[in-house]
């Protein structure tokens, strides 16, 4: 008779539900972490692509920095609010920074021209929870020697 009562009280039908209830929160945290990581990586890659677009324009001979900046910002897919692309030109004779109108080597050589393209933005995670709720600054910089 003891054997029969042991089988009655030993019911395993709820074990799977309890295991599922214990595992689901962990799986949700992992899923949200993967989504946040993917969002960060795709934002960074999109930003790098926009800087590359601007760099290609400069290497093809674009001289209007404002237009190049606008093209870079418009090619940045799903850019965050406050995203910025800046272009700066630096004229150098050797290791010395000079004016655009200066000539090097006693007036015989034009200075080297370097164009610095810099993109910055603040990335915010799509899901805000726990330690993953922090926004981060992302940026990419490229320097091109034009002449």
Labelled PLM ranges:
Residues 1-75:
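Alpha-helical assembly-interface signal, strongest on the long, hydrophobic N-terminal helix that forms
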Residues 2-3, 44, 52-147:
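Short, conserved structural patches
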